[in-house]
Amino acid sequence: MLMFDPVPVKQEAMDPVSVSYPSNYMESMKPNKYGVIYSTPLPEKFFQTPEGLSHGIQMEPVDLTVNKRSSPPSAGNSPSSLKFPSSHRRASPGLSMPSSSPPIKKYSPPSPGVQPFGVPLSMPPVMAAALSRHGIRSPGILPVIQPVVVQPVPFMYTSHLQQPLMVSLSEEMENSSSSMQVPVIESYEKPISQKKIKIEPGIEPQRTDYYPEEMSPPLMNSVSPPQALLQENHPSVIVQPGKRPLPVESPDTQRKRRIHRCDYDGCNKVYTKSSHLKAHRRTHTGEKPYKCTWEGCTWKFARSDELTRHFRKHTGIKPFQCPDCDRSFSRSDHLALHRKRHMLV
């Protein structure tokens, strides 16, 4: 009985090859459902004898299918060691197998690092009798029959010899891919991007990123490349008070008087509020929209706060009182001057 490993092998395309055999041998193969056909014709002494050829035996062509890459020929033609090449369809009477048996694999040549193996096969008496008729003597055990494929099998599978190699290769690829996914560069860049600046109390840092469009060109290019590299290498910077005065056009100064500038010729006044700029423009135009409503008073003012202070003269209201004495004032600036006198005494 044939003993084979049921591990599947990879299927390859078949090409038809015609080989001639004796008619009596072909007739003995017809009743069998399964069979093995050799990719290369066996020696003539197996199937052709001088006696058979002299009696006029007719040779018939047989359509066979073999692999494109035929397996290497057998090592020797001795009767005791016989190796059959790649896949076939029909078999001799002694190699018939029942339909319930598992599919027999196709043998693929092992890799250079793997030792070849053989499957011992017991020679049934029917096959021994068939081979003895053609001049072959069998010792009872045929050492190795490498590839045997049964026709009803619809597809082939990969040999089990390649499976350990494929598994080890996939494991190595997984290990290599997992080691390549370590973000080494990002871990070093993140701490550098987070910079802390230590500032002494009483000094406000220059906010150059708030209003970069308002900075003058000399201030934008004031930092030289060596200083920029020094700042990159030393993220912690300590600003000492009193070492350098703030420039005239510093960002803080620009932020306080950045937009509201008088556009009259010869006037360079700048205001932080648009209402103050409007009141200043009235000094150029002479417009005084705020008129006193007190009866008999014709005073007009360009600013509303001026009208408010004027109206307190009519009412006598003095909301600003000194905390050190009982005096009161109608204007806040008058109260500030009075308190300075208390400090000087």
UniProtKB/Swiss-Prot annotation:
Q: Name one GO cellular component term.
A: chromatin
Modifications the protein undergoes after translation, according to the UniProt entry: Sumoylated with SUMO1. Sumoylation is enhanced by PIAS1, PIAS2alpha and PIAS2beta, and PIAS4, but not by Pc2. Enhances transcriptional repression, but has no effect on DNA binding. Sumoylation on Lys-198 is the major site.
Q: Where is region (Disordered) located?
A: 66-112
Q: Name one GO biological process term.
A: hemopoiesis
Please tell me whether the keyword Phosphoprotein is annotated for this protein: yes
A GO term, aspect molecular function: DNA-binding transcription factor activity
Q: Sorted alphabetically, which CDD domains does this protein's record hold?
A: KLF3_N
Which UniProt keywords are given for this protein, alphabetically ordered? Activator, DNA-binding, Isopeptide bond, Metal-binding, Nucleus, Phosphoprotein, Repeat, Repressor, Transcription, Transcription regulation, Ubl conjugation, Zinc, Zinc-finger
- Annotated Low complexity bias: 70-81, 92-108
Q: Which residues carry this modification: Phosphoserine?
A: 71, 92, 101, 108, 111, 216, 224, 250
Record-listed cross-link Glycyl lysine isopeptide (Lys-Gly) (interchain with G-Cter in SUMO2), residues: 68, 196, 198
The domain of life is Eukaryota
Q: Where is this motif: CTBP-binding motif?
A: 61-65
Cross-link type Glycyl lysine isopeptide (Lys-Gly) (interchain with G-Cter in SUMO), placed at 10
Where does this protein reside within or beyond the cell?
Answer: Nucleus
InterPro entries from the xrefs?
Znf_C2H2_sf, Znf_C2H2_type
Zinc fingers typed C2H2-type, residue spans: 260-284, 290-314, 320-342
- Describe the protein's quaternary organization and the partners it interacts with: Monomer.
What protein is this chain from?
Krueppel-like factor 3
**Upper classification of the organism:** Eukaryota, Metazoa, Chordata, Craniata, Vertebrata
Q: Which gene encodes it?
A: KLF3
